[in-house]
Swiss-Prot record:
The keyword Aminoacyl-tRNA synthetase does not apply. The keyword Secreted does not apply. Disulfide bonds: none annotated. InterPro entries: CpcT/CpeT, CpcT/CpeT_sf. The lineage of its organism: Bacteria, Bacillati, Cyanobacteriota, Cyanophyceae, Synechococcales. Belongs to the CpcT/CpeT biliprotein lyase family. This is Chromophore lyase CpcT/CpeT 2. GO terms for molecular function: lyase activity. Its EC number is 4.-.-.-. Covalently attaches a chromophore to Cys residue(s) of phycobiliproteins. CDD domains: CpcT (cd16338). It is an enzyme of class 4 (lyase). Keywords: Lyase.
């Protein structure tokens, strides 16, 4: 692993590298939480020049049809970590690569990605957790059902659990328009890919 990566950055990357499921939460509270899988597949170092992940989020019964595809980059900024978010310009080309066709990710390059300004997540270590929130400024724009909103993300990451809460907020009233109303999704790691980091 690169000597320029801090111990905390590497620790967060190890904990994030994997396939996560909220099956237990979905069983406990089916009216509010669908059964979802979210995969953070480590990218070859050459793609972003450091620690990056290809991300797919899908309903558990339809892993081959992800409803969210993204690329994230972990960087050290001061005494914290920043998660930079990108969207693939041709998402169909990479569909399924988080699980079944991971070797194809070696063909991914920065030219295949569009950076999402205002959508960085600022992360701090708090005891045994990494805690992150969307950067200030309400600039991470998301259009949902024809309505412009801004994304507000919070996340908690521990060794085996990843909790996230994405909410779309009205830019005028700052009230929630979309997203889980019953609190964050709680994902448990079911597959570990940390051995693939920084290859």
């Amino acid at each position: 692993m690169e000597s320029t990566s801090s111990p905390e950055l590497l620790q967060m990357a190890r904990w994030l590298a994997g396939d996560f499921s909220n099956q237990e939460q979905a069983w406990e509270n089916p009216p509010f939480f669908a059964s979802i899988r979210v995969a953070y597949r480590p990218l070859p170092t050459a793609v972003l020049g450091g620690i990056g992940f290809y991300v797919e989020q899908a309903y558990s019964g339809h892993l081959e049809e992800p409803y969210r595809q993204a690329v994230v980059e972990l960087t050290q900024v001061g005494d914290g970590i920043v998660i930079r978010n990108y969207r693939p310009l041709q998402p169909q080309r990479w569909r399924g690569c988080a699980r079944g066709r991971a070797e194809q990710l070696s063909q991914l390059s920065a030219a295949d990605l569009a950076y999402l300004p205002g959508c960085d997540v600022q992360v701090k270590r708090q005891g045994s957790l990494f805690v992150g929130v969307t950067e200030p400024g309400c600039r991470c724009c998301v259009v949902r059902n024809g309505q412009t909103t801004y994304l507000q993300t919070t996340l908690h990451l521990s060794e085996n659990e990843f909790c996230s809460h994405d909410r779309g907020m009205d830019p005028v009233t700052h009230r929630q328009v979309w997203g889980a109303v019953a609190g964050p999704f709680r994902f448990r790691k079911v597959v570990d890919w940390q051995a693939e980091l920084l290859q």
